[in-house]
Amino acid sequence: MLFTVAWASLAAMFSFSIAMVVWGRNGDGTLNF
């Protein structure tokens, strides 16, 4: 259970950081992946 929660939070933080990099590189605030 604890491992599952830890893995889910790690995956969420990783995907969030990737999204921040994509949005920051895009520069105009649109969701253009």
Swiss-Prot record:
Subunit structure comment from the entry: The 4 large subunits of the cytochrome b6-f complex are cytochrome b6, subunit IV (17 kDa polypeptide, PetD), cytochrome f and the Rieske protein, while the 4 small subunits are PetG, PetL, PetM and PetN. The complex functions as a dimer.
Source superkingdom: Bacteria
Membrane topology label: Single-pass membrane protein
Keyword Thylakoid: yes
Protein name as catalogued: Cytochrome b6-f complex subunit 8
Any single biological process term in GO: cytochrome complex assembly
Spans through the membrane: 2-22
Record's subcellular location: Cellular thylakoid membrane
UniProt similarity note: Belongs to the PetN family.
Function comment: Component of the cytochrome b6-f complex, which mediates electron transfer between photosystem II (PSII) and photosystem I (PSI), cyclic electron flow around PSI, and state transitions.
A GO molecular-function annotation: electron transporter, transferring electrons within cytochrome b6/f complex of photosystem II activity
